[in-house]
Amino acid sequence: MAKICDHCGKKPQSGNNVSHANNKSKRRFEPNLVSVRAQLPSGEVKTVTVCTRCLRSGAVVKPVAKHA
């Protein structure tokens, strides 16, 4: 599974681990992604992988639960 947000396209960035002695080694900063059931603009409900920032901002709409 690619670590990419389906809504905003956020993906991993590269950076450094920096030790106390100021030694540097490469690392990856990965986005905080979650799989949620979301209602698409067409009205279809689908499972999508989105970052938590998109969830909190309301960019992704969760479907209304159907109760029997």
Curated annotation (Swiss-Prot):
Compositionally biased tracts (Polar residues): 13-22
Region (Disordered): 1-30
One GO biological process term: translation
Keyword set, alphabetical order: Ribonucleoprotein, Ribosomal protein
Top-rank lineage group of the source organism: Bacteria
Matching Gene3D superfamilies: Ribosomal protein L28/L24
GO-annotated molecular function: structural constituent of ribosome
Cellular component, GO annotation: ribonucleoprotein complex; ribosome
Cell membrane listed as a keyword: no
HAMAP family (UniProt xref): Ribosomal_bL28
UniProt record similarity statement: Belongs to the bacterial ribosomal protein bL28 family.
Protein name: Large ribosomal subunit protein bL28
Organism: Solidesulfovibrio magneticus (strain ATCC 700980 / DSM 13731 / RS-1) (Desulfovibrio magneticus)
Gene for this chain: rpmB
